[in-house]
Amino acid sequence: MNTLLKKKSIICACMNREKNLKKSLDSWLSSGDADEIVIVDWSSDTPLSFEHPKVKILRVQGESSWCLSMAYNLAASLASGDILYKLDCDYIIKEGFFENHLPEDTFYCGNYKLARDDNEKHLNGCLVVKKQDFDKVNGYNENIVTYGWEDSDIYNRLEKTSERKDINFDFIQHIPHEDSKRAFGKDVNKLIIENKSIAIKKRWLSTSKKSSYFITKQKEKTI
């Protein structure tokens, strides 16, 4: 199938970031190119909801702390598209984003080394990948349960079978906020070092077991 005709799924996970999500979601819908937007509400204090036929919000109850690896693995499992566009809830996309990031035998990901300012470094987590390739590497390493290195870990595993290409930062921007909010008050550099060590010691394999959850679909209501 022509890549242009393949079904495109935006996947996102969020915990108490509804203001940023609202700004980002407007840009995702304005693009008109995504076939569906799957959002996992990771036990936000106030349940997320949004009324739009392309938007599917599913809530995980009872999680006291943010875990990107588990939240995004769940979002990916709920997506029906051929191509996954993994966006954080503070990523705004611009016109041309989709047509400039269509993977064949490739995947696209953020590269902080190409950042033109400190804020663009936070686009490192953006990932565009065929769902079959994401599933082949079994998604994110769920042994990494805090912020940092989960993106580098999956990029390293994807590179074993696909060519890595850089996200074009001209078509995406990050909504600025403090690192302390991202890492929930913990030292970011320390977390990255710790999680890199975990990824080496506890390799994530195609046979590694993912977590499972009881999820509920949100009532349709505009936020």
Regions found by a protein language model. Name each.
Residues 108-123:
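Short beta-strand-to-loop element that shapes/binds the nucleotide-sugar donor at the catalytic cleft/hinge
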Residues 7-9, 36, 153:
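Cell-envelope/extracellular polymer assembly enzymes that use nucleotide-activated donors
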Residues 8-20, 24, 31:
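A conserved hydrophobic helix/loop-capping motif in glycosyltransferases and polysaccharide synthases
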Residues 62-79:
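Glycine-rich, basic loop-to-helix element that forms the pyrophosphate-binding segment
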Residues 152-223:
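C-terminal catalytic/acceptor-binding lobe
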Residues 25-63:
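Acidic donor-binding segment of Leloir-type glycosyltransferases
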Residues 138-156:
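Donor nucleotide-sugar recognition loop
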